[in-house]
Amino acid sequence: MTKLIIMTLCLIMSFIFMQMKHPLSMGLMLLIQTFLTCLITSIYVKTFWFSYVLFLIFLGGMLILFIYVTSLSSNEMFSMSFSLTLISLIIFSIFTIVFFMIDKSLIEQFITNMEMEKLSNMNNLINENILSLNKMYNFPTNLITLLLINYLFLTLLVTVKITKKFYGPLRPMN
């Protein structure tokens, strides 16, 4: 049920994204879409690490896009369409009503099955998380982890040294 609601929200956000004209509103819709995608991946994957890293990567890219967009279109007026908001609210309400009009016994059976599955898999999930973290920091893979840490640190230093304070794609402040 939760998956259906989140996927419905993704479809509605995709529809709204196609109707947006201002770059900042497009960025906001893309950020919400990314958050919903991360929620879906966290439902399917047993650990939240993948969806967390995915969200951070998208957020970093969105921050860079936000800087470029605000420097290039800073004087453009931002306005929200009331009719678009109303249409999306009506579509979401219709989907919610359709979900709740499904046979109640199927919904109750689905909820009890999910609760029983959560209770039975809780111990397996805890043990699996501990084992996956142990694998990451034990001998064969700890070298890859250290290499990744050093590479990211070196990339950070090179990026700081390459960028100059008064040059670049952003407009100078007067």
From Swiss-Prot:
Function: Core subunit of the mitochondrial membrane respiratory chain NADH dehydrogenase (Complex I) that is believed to belong to the minimal assembly required for catalysis. Complex I functions in the transfer of electrons from NADH to the respiratory chain. The immediate electron acceptor for the enzyme is believed to be ubiquinone.
Annotated catalysed reactions: a ubiquinone + NADH + 5 H(+)(in) = a ubiquinol + NAD(+) + 4 H(+)(out)
Domain of life: Eukaryota
MF annotations from Gene Ontology: NADH dehydrogenase (ubiquinone) activity
Protein name: NADH-ubiquinone oxidoreductase chain 6
EC number: 7.1.1.2
TM spans (from-to): 25-45, 48-68, 82-102, 143-163
Keywords: Electron transport, Membrane, Mitochondrion, NAD, Respiratory chain, Translocase, Transmembrane, Transmembrane helix, Transport, Ubiquinone
Keyword Transferase part of the UniProt annotation: no
Annotated membrane topology: Multi-pass membrane protein
Family: Belongs to the complex I subunit 6 family.
Organism: Anopheles albimanus
GO cellular component: mitochondrial membrane
A Pfam family annotated for this UniProt entry: Oxidored_q3
Location within or outside the cell: Mitochondrion membrane
